[in-house]
């Protein structure tokens, strides 16, 4: 989202004199200027509610398919809008390692310089989801002290990559 015009700031859903539909259509147009394929929008529940109130019964449903599961979601101009919890829509996150003092809880939290996102629009092919699994440890029933059963332990890590030539295909709308 480094290219000029691919980041919009200062919109708060529900503020008088603003239009959620206009903001979304501007984002879709900006991405379509440089990309011709299918797009997807991830949006906060607040933004989706404002969009639905503006369109009052006129919003179209689209079938979004991922991993063999088909889901009906709202759409604008054929772009499915996926509801994403607000606590996952930040410009920067801090990853807690679970070991360091103050990071024992693990997981992630909002970064100190982070701003909240309303939504982002990108081609479905831009983000590449990667999963990695640590070495699996297998314990037989004689070693497993909790149960008379086999036990397997492993850690799974997830990451989302955007290739160096694709950041300009992502449009961010920041609060």
What do the PLM-derived regions correspond to, one by one?
Residues 5, 9-12, 54-175:
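Sequence/fold signature of self-assembling virion shell proteins
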Residues 2-73:
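Extended, solvent-exposed, turn-rich assembly/linker loops in the middle of proteins
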């Amino acid at each position: 989202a480094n290219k000029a015009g691919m980041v919009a700031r200062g919109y708060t859903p529900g503020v008088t004199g603003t239009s959620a539909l206009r903001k979304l259509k501007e984002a879709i147009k900006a991405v379509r200027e440089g990309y011709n394929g299918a797009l997807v929008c991830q949006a906060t529940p607040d933004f989706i509610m404002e969009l639905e109130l503006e369109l009052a019964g006129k919003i179209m449903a689209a079938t979004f398919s991922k991993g063999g599961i088909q889901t009906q979601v709202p759409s604008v101009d054929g772009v499915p809008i996926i509801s994403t919890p607000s606590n996952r829509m930040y410009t920067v996150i801090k990853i807690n390692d679970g070991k360091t003092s103050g990071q024992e809880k693990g997981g992630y939290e909002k970064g100190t310089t982070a701003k909240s996102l309303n939504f982002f629009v990108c081609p479905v092919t831009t983000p590449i989801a990667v999963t990695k699994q640590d070495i699996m440890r297998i314990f037989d029933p004689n070693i497993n002290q909790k149960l008379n059963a086999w036990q397997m332990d492993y850690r799974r890590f997830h990451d989302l990559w955007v290739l160096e030539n694709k950041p300009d295909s992502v449009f961010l709308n920041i609060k």
